[in-house]
Design a protein with these regions (language model features):
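Conserved core segment of the aminotransferase class I/II
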Residues: 224-303, 313-314, 398
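N-terminal small-domain helix-loop-helix segment of the aminotransferase-like
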Residues: 2-102, 109, 276, 288-291, ...
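Conserved PLP-anchoring active-site segment centered on the Schiff-base-forming lysine
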Residues: 113-135
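PLP-dependent enzyme catalytic core of the Aspartate aminotransferase-like
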Residues: 86, 161-162, 343-349, 353-362, ...
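Conserved glycine-rich beta-strand-loop-beta hairpin in the small C-terminal domain of fold type I
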Residues: 286, 302-313, 324-338, 372
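Active-site phosphate-binding strand-loop segment of PLP-dependent enzymes
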Residues: 143, 148-219
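A short helix-loop-beta submotif of the ANL/AMP-binding
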Residues: 137-143
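Helix C-cap/helix->beta junction micro-motif
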Residues: 27-30, 138, 198-199, 229, ...
Length: 403
């Protein structure tokens, strides 16, 4: 008897760790060194967590062997609550904070608790593909609104408005954005929130990169602009504190919660079903949020992340036929390949061919639900010398590549 996967997974896709990665693993098993520019995982590139975070986790291990409250440790949730108080988010209490095994788990939970079959959720294109996958897995229908490359990758408000229907339940905002690195202006956020207000939409705001900002970029917390809207804000320690493997994230729920008691009960139920988040990692949250913010040293002038962002952007734009909007936040660049210079009809084939030829692993743009096969994403985490080598190989590859 053949055992098949569930029909629920028929349209679920997460190509950041998709079929091309399997080819990369096979090449590694054959002895090839693969430079992985496919995922924002700081630790393998030499970005280490602050010592005091590691020390506090170790110190608390003897008392972290049992379950915690399903929402998480009181001390960690209070630290998150105070974090949003400092960001001028109104009405967030201890019971409005849920800790999770990374933001990823919480995204899935929030969609499972909200959506019925056929409900629509507005998701940016390009997006972090887990949002699209989580909507689909919950029985919903992701509707992608365009972000405008010619306007620094800001969301196209007219496109959002045109795609709202009676079935639309929620609006997803990813700011700072992955894969583009865009950091949205207050004016753009206010425009998006006004559309949510007019159509009674729940707002999901993914802010995992809120501390990774370059040049004069300023992050505005979405919920601080909309005390009258139900807003779920997602964040965690993975990126800013370089502990992606700890799987430590949270949701903060703000706005008129009295109108959403049934939905919140659904989130409570799902939180209870998975018992609790990783308890040792919960002990990192209070120290991380309350301690010295070492991420600032990495993004200010002479900081390693800023230098690598600059180098990535300069080198990509130096390749004939390639253009890239300067990322103002996060850990990625999302360059465009001019189809007049190098026509690509299948971008998954492009990244596989690049892997086989140059031993570089990047991600095709369509993996981020971008509708055209003319972009790819690279991480800006490697050291400058490795970036020089990697992007030089991409340039040489494109000189002769044809589909």
């Amino acid at each position: 008897m053949q055992v098949s996967k569930s029909n629920k997974l028929a349209n679920v896709c997460y190509d950041i760790r998709g079929p091309v990665l399997k080819h990369a693993k096979r090449l590694e098993e054959e002895g090839h060194r693969i430079l992985k520019l496919n995922i924002g995982n700081p630790a393998p590139f030499g970005f280490e967590a602050p010592d005091e975070i590691l020390q506090d986790v170790i110190r608390n291990l003897p008392t972290a062997q049992g379950y915690s409250d399903s929402k998480g440790l009181f001390s960690a949730r209070k630290a998150v609550m105070q974090y949003y108080q400092q960001k001028q988010v109104e009405g967030v209490g201890i019971e409005d904070i849920y800790l999770g095994n990374g933001v990823s788990e919480l995204i899935v939970m929030s969609m499972q608790a909200l959506l019925n079959n056929g409900d629509e959720v507005l998701v940016p294109a390009p997006d972090y593909p887990l949002w699209t996958a989580a909507v689909t897995l919950a029985g919903g229908h992701p509707v992608h609104y365009l972000c405008d490359e010619g306007a620094d990758w800001f969301p196209d408000l007219a496109d959002i408005k045109a795609k709202i229907t009676p079935n639309t339940k929620a609006l997803v905002i990813i700011n700072p954005n992955t894969p583009t690195g865009a950091v949205y202006s207050k004016e753009v956020l206010l425009g998006m929130l006004e559309l949510a207000r007019q159509h009674n939409l729940v707002v999901f705001s993914d802010e995992i990169y809120d501390k990774i900002l370059y040049d004069d970029a300023v992050h505005v917390c979405t919920a601080s602009l909309a005390p009258d809207l139900l807003c779920l804000t997602f964040n965690g320690l993975s990126k800013s504190y370089r502990v992606a493997g700890f799987r430590s994230g949270w949701i903060a729920i703000s706005g008129p919660k009295h109108n959403a008691q049934s939905y919140i009960e659904g989130i409570d139920m799902l939180a209870n079903m998975r018992l609790c988040a990783n308890v040792p990692s919960q002990h990192a949250i209070q120290t991380a949020l309350g301690g010295y913010q070492s991420i600032n040293d990495l993004v200010l002038p002479q900081g390693r992340l800023l230098e690598q962002r600059n180098r990535t952007w300069e080198l990509l734009n130096a390749i004939p036929g390639v253009s890239c909007v300067k990322p103002m936040g996060a850990l990625y660049a999302f360059p465009r390949i001019d189809p007049k210079v190098c026509p690509i009809f299948n971008d998954e084939k492009f990244v596989l061919d690049l892997l086989l030829s140059e031993k570089l692993l990047v991600v095709q743009g369509t993996a981020f639900n971008w509708p055209w096969p003319d972009h790819f994403r690279v991480v800006t985490l490697p050291r400058v010398d490795d970036l020089d080598m990697a992007i030089g190989r991409i340039g040489n590859f494109l000189k002769s590549y044809r589909q």
